[in-house]
Amino acid sequence: MRPLGSALSPATLMVLVLLLVPACGQDYPPAVLSEPQLQSLARSVKALQKGEPLPELEKIPSIQSVYLAWYDSGRRIGHSWQSGAGVAVAMEQAAAGSRHGKEADHAELSLAYGFRPLDPAHLGDDLSPVHRGVRGVEIAHGGVVVRFAPSQMIADNLSFERALTRAAAQLGIDGDTLLVEARLATFDALQVVIDLRAEPIATQLFRGNHTLPDTAVTGTAVEQFATDMAGWMQRNLHENGRMTYLYYPTSDRESDSNNMIRQWMASLCLTRMGVASGDEQMLASARLNIRHNLDQFYSLESGLGIIEYRGKVKLGAVALAALAILEHPDRARFAAQFNALVAMTDHLWRENGSFQTFYRPAERSANPNLHNFYPGETLLLWATMLEREDDAAREARFMQSFRYYREWHLAQRKPSFIPWHTQAYYLRWQKTGSEELRDWIFEMNDWLLTMQTHSRLAYDDTRGRFYDPAPERAHFGPPHASSTGVYLEGLIDAYQLALAEADKQRARAYRESIRAGLRSAMQLQLRNDETLWFAPNRERAVGGLRTTVYNNVIRVDNVQHTLMGVMKMLEFTSEREQQLLSAGADKEALLPLN
């Protein structure tokens, strides 16, 4: 069978296959390549690039096929698969020198092994998203083979479903025919990226990345994590004040979609960045962003402030726009808009404590899932207002909503409800000391921790995310960086509450959950190193957070939620440390990062 889509001379890969593919029957290759093996791969690929004789290559047992791709400034300029046929011809061609990859600055190498057939009836399990970037897939039909390497799927941000669709198109058949007639297989691969810019350096990756150990969560590392996220926010704020909503690192382009709730959360994050740093320029940037969003999406209707996008006016967008204005030191500039937006939240409140979640179209309020988000966002606005100024009537409405949604949540629990309500109720608890609020914060977050218990699903890089794969929890939604981020925002408040109440058992549980969540979030950050070999515009990608370990799309709330949680944590631990040191107290009460 001949592989489809070969853009390179077969010699380039066949020489590697000759040296890497062993006799049949040997064991799997080592999971971790030795330094001599990596150096040998680097020298060999560099020699292939330059058309020079190959140096002696360290043997790597049990490799069945080789995928090699050349990259120039983050763009793939050639790639090919080769297996072990025609070795003599391949060596002769290689001796003449490969004409491909002369301009490459990086090479992506996948050494494939462990090929095994796939049953189309069980593709959902065998090609579950969690295997993306770890397993490759092979499709054979009519004497033609199409393969997708795990690292290639990461670089192209390609799901298994899209890979099969792409294969069907290349093979000239439809999806149904592919499932019935094609031979499907999956395989594993050792993934190596080689920097060819000077002395070649080979780095082994897992899922196109480095898997962070628990020990990576240190105070210094978390501070750098926050700094890099803040840098992404700043670089993706445009000159006119527009914030990037969703960015594709592979193709260096933005999505044309948008979301008002996430945009206004980004506005709030920019303001908090400026307040935390005391940077007047950052506050000016946040103000510019608020002005841009108001100019584009705000209007006044019968005295009510509206945030509208494509005919939709959501309670959550209105509330978060008001909160972003409220927290900015220059809020007086936007006083009229703020008052009208607050009036809209009051207009959508109901006497039983519930909220109408959509102003327009009103019928969208019938969707019960929206009550997991928008009311909590609104109560956070109200709690922030009450923190600044007493208002007996608003306090009464706040508590009415608290009691309504406490019962509502118990009847239909979802984790997405918890962080917003936790933050709102913690603000009120700080001022009132309400046992009702305290107990409910603990009850919500105790349950939330169960979402993290089984976070290691097949691979170490998934540890710490808030996702439970149990079938009865499928309706909670897929794993997502923004979810981990917002859960961290709420958990740090719950942790502070547990410390204040001297509840050591809860404090330890919340602390460990926060540390695990931080490891997961740090795992998702794009760094300016060999793990970005596929990104043509590193400046726009660095510091951003992938959506998952296998999906490199950066959505603004991936970064914003996580950054706001980390900023809150760093501020708390710093203040708490000073209090403890001055009092000579035990540092056990701190969130230990070092």
Predicted regions and their residues:
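Bacterial N-terminal signal peptides
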Residues: 10-22
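Basic nucleic-acid-binding interfaces
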Residues: 27-199
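Low-complexity, Ser/Thr/Pro/Gly-enriched N-terminal "stalk/linker" regions
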Residues: 198-261, 280, 285-288, 292, ...
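Well-ordered alpha-helical scaffold segments within catalytic/enzyme domains
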Residues: 208-219, 264-280, 319-333, 377-391, ...
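Extended, well-ordered alpha-helical scaffold segments
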Residues: 218-233, 278-296, 330-348, 389-408, ...
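Carbohydrate-binding/catalytic loop surfaces
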Residues: 243-259, 302-323, 355-377, 419-434, ...
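CBM-like carbohydrate-recognition segments
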Residues: 258, 452-490, 494-594
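Solenoidal tandem-repeat scaffolds enriched in leucines and small polar residues
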Residues: 344-403, 407
